Amino acid sequence: YEAALSAAGCFIRMYPLQKEKGFLLQDDFCDDLTDDLDLVFLCNPNNPTGLTIPQELLLKILDNCRERNIYLVLDECFIEFLPEPEKVTMQGKLDEYPNLLILRAFTKIYAMPGLRLGYLLCSDEDLLDRISRSMQSWNVSIPAQMAGLAALNEDAYVKEARELIGKERAWMKAELEKAGLTVWDSCANYLFFEGPKGLAARLEKGGILIRDCSNYPGLADGYYRAAVR
């Protein structure tokens, strides 16, 4: 999002999450919602931590955004990995908050990232029309469309994937903690942890790839994200 906004010439204000606060979004986020803002991006669950934002805080943020005519873009691309995503998603608030935009993806839960298939939810039809008119004419490939239609019939797969990833995530977290690493309680298909500096480069030599998170705002060398497979 930072790259896209920068390319459009937007002024960007960051809100780095803090280790001493568990890398959780805090109530003081609302203090940063000033009248000079047009758009706010939040990721729920967060990437790279996998932590979710409490609904009470999200509603408070939504109210503040609505009062100041700020659009809130909520990235829920990893929400399907939660045991009960319907209890966390803000999809039920779309009619109440026309300033709410929700991003969802097929590519995460259905494990087909190369096809690049996702969608936007919003109750502001005029805004959706303006967004549609600014997009490329052929923005979704036919293979992606066919894969998306097929994926909609895979309810059993989604259920099995959630259960398997939940089980493997708990095992992987326990094993990383046994190795002396600090691991946060992710709800997604990855784990965020703190370890020795240079760990990603050393593991790569052994054929193991993890995400070095040192280029995330507020993070330094020694923070990593590992996929749960």
Please identify what each model-predicted range represents.
Residues S6, F23-D36, P48-L72, E76-I109:
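Active-site pre-lysine segment of PLP-dependent enzymes
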Residues M14, L74, I102, I210-D212:
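Hydrophobic residues in well-ordered beta-strands that form the structural core
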Residues M14-P16, L39-N46, L72-E76, W184-S186:
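Short beta-strands and strand-loop turn motifs
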Residues N99-W184:
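PLP-dependent aminotransferase class I/II
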